[in-house]
Amino acid sequence: MNSNEDIHEERIEVPRTPHQTQPEKDSDRIALRDEISVPEGDEKAYSDEKVEMATTNASSNFGSNESAKDGESIGAFSNPHEALMQSKLREESQSKTILPSDDLSQQLETEESKVEEALKRITSPPLPPRADCIEESASALKSSLPPVLAGNKNDQAPLDRPQLPPRQVVNAETLHLKAPHGNATPSKSPTSAVGNSSSSTPPTLPPRRIEDPLDLAAQKHFLASTFKRNMLFYKSEDNSIKCDLDKNILNLKEDSKKINNNEIPEEVSSFWLKVIGDYQNILINDIETLHFQLSRGIPAAYRLVVWQLVSYAKSKSFDPIYETYLTEMAPFDVQEFENQLKMMDEVPSEYVKRISNVLKAYLLFDPECEFSTDIAYIINMILDVCEEEANAFGLLVRLMKVYGLRLLFLPSASEIDILCYKFDRLVEEFYPEIHNHMVEKGVRSSMFLPGFFTTLFQKKLPTEIQPRIGDMVFLEGIDSIMRILATLLSNSRDHLLKMGFDDMLELLKSGLLDAYIKQNDGTRGDTLLSNECMDKLLQDSMMKVAITPKTMKKYSSEYEEIHRLDNEKEVQYKSITEKNLHLQKHVRKLENDYTSLNREHVTIANELVKNRLNIESVLNENNGYKLQILDLKKKLDSEKKKQVLGVYVPNDLKKDLEETMKKNTQVMDENLKLQDRISELERLIEEIKTANKNGTLFEYSNSKNNPLGAGWSGFKKVFK
């Protein structure tokens, strides 16, 4: 059930409209409500509303004495309606006695139902939007109310009337008026005039995201970021390699306990033993101490163990690889390289062959990496720490592959440009005067900076200090070297600001260390003072130059964003160049094809000319033949005409031919008979001759009994 205060709140909200300052219109509204039929149970609610309307109209007069009395209490509220409501509730609470809990609950229920019924029947002008009102509830309430009755035109508010401030919800908890505790039944949640209910249940918060302490440390310290990168490399390896690395790490931890640390202070020795025992825990809980101890250098007795532990460089797999590459042919002139090493003051003579072996093995291991004498300085630093060449090879592989140093020795060497940009931004942020002077004189970091990174600053530092650079690189990464250069620039600030292009470039290339030693009361000839100056330089660079991995990452993102368009243009240019080369090859091919086709065309054209000439000759010959044929046809026609005119052919030629053929047949038969007779007579003549010769008498015998003259009679008939 609602409390008594909620009832007063609902009653006050009903007449609170922009027309409260017009008594005539309020009276019209009261009269209009009186005309509406009201149930008997709601008469009290309407009478209370009339009283409240009159009270509101009276309070709207600014010159009333009552408002002057309550000026202080009303002034405490930013909204005058809230002040009026507060004063009215305070008066009613003083005049009324507190009812028992059961009676109070019943009365509250009754009053709430009356107020709800009255609100349904009351027609009021639209109120200004409330700050805590929900749009859906307001639209629902507006649709449920009856239409507003038209009033008198003279009652309309003037156009220059100020708007009232937004209404605020005032509930029992705000006024500190609560129902008495006891056996009272639980009351309903208070309902506002627009129908939205207040809820005491707070919204459920999303689960809190707990950041990894190592990730948080990796944003602020190079120590943690480098360890995190090495951990990612470790997790990416095969299980067999992981087992080998884990086994060797345990061996390193056991070997570290056997190291003779008598010459090392106990505090320093115990700290580095803790680092070796649980490096990740030190990074999370005591990274500042680790950074401080690193600025003073890792003790020489623990240096190799720490390097191999942090970089995961202790692996048995490097031994057979190194031995295999030693037997192969080097990708460079070994003799010439060794002669160059002998000329270097920083390289001891006993390291020449060992440096050559390690460099040969690595270049065979990583063929993409180009040969450079600067790598010899890095190998020399590693050999100062470890005696075995295989261990030096493993450290060099990790330094190149995992720490990204190989990117400086690739043919493109794009990483150098990124490092130069990072250094420029670092100088611009920490030493803007030096940066502006360098830009003004045209000196760019790419003119002097690459040599420091490719040699890891080994070319300029004394031999005793060189392993300290290895401490920084293996534990913090390559970006940590920028601290040294930034410290040297800061130390030579006054000299740099007075120099021109040539002098400044010469100082930046080779004179920064000399200037630092000279300024700190040391000389190159005094080795002790020089080492002390270099030690101070490293400490100052690590403790005073505050750069973070987050800053370096921001610089890298800036570089990528700046050069993104350039890279896109370069990629586009390369693609266009490749396409152009392809098109040029295609053009050459087309030209060759065109040349061959042109030759074929010339040959075919020549043949065509010859064929045309032959065709002309054939056509001429053909025309001659045609003329000859025409002449022959004419002659033939003339001959035919002559034969037709000169010869008479009778009509019964066929019959004559048949008769002639028959006669010819008969003649032929007779001819055959005569031929036979001639043959017989010739035979007879021969017999007669033979008989005469023999002197015998010839006797003629005719077997056919034909007279000798019978045949001649037939012959005569033929020729009749």
From Swiss-Prot:
The lineage of its organism: Eukaryota, Fungi, Dikarya, Ascomycota, Saccharomycotina. Residues 1-132, 144-164, 179-210 are annotated as: Disordered. This is Probable GTPase-activating protein GYL1. SMART domains: TBC (SM00164). GO terms for molecular function: GTPase activator activity. The modification N-acetylmethionine is found at residue 1. Pfam families: RabGap-TBC_2 (PF23436). Residues 572-696 form a coiled coil. Gene3D superfamilies: putative rabgap domain of human tbc1 domain family member 14 like domains, Ypt/Rab-GAP domain of gyp1p, domain 3. Interacts with GYP5 and RVS167. Is part of SEC4-containing complexes. It is found in: Cytoplasm; Bud; Bud neck. Residues 54-66, 95-108, 184-196 have a biased composition (Polar residues). There is a cross-link at residue 498 (Glycyl lysine isopeptide (Lys-Gly) (interchain with G-Cter in SUMO)). GO terms for cellular component: cellular bud; cellular bud neck; cellular bud tip; cytoplasm; Golgi-associated vesicle; incipient cellular bud site; mitochondrion; plasma membrane. GO terms for biological process: endoplasmic reticulum to Golgi vesicle-mediated transport; exocytosis; protein transport; regulation of exocytosis. The modification Phosphothreonine is found at residue 17. Probable GTPase-activating protein which stimulates the GTP hydrolysis rate by GYP5 of YPT1 and SEC4. Involved in ER to Golgi trafficking and polarized exocytosis. Residues 1-52, 111-120 have a biased composition (Basic and acidic residues). It comes from Saccharomyces cerevisiae (strain ATCC 204508 / S288c). Present with 2010 molecules/cell in log phase SD medium. Signal peptide: none annotated. Residues 297-477 form the Rab-GAP TBC domain.
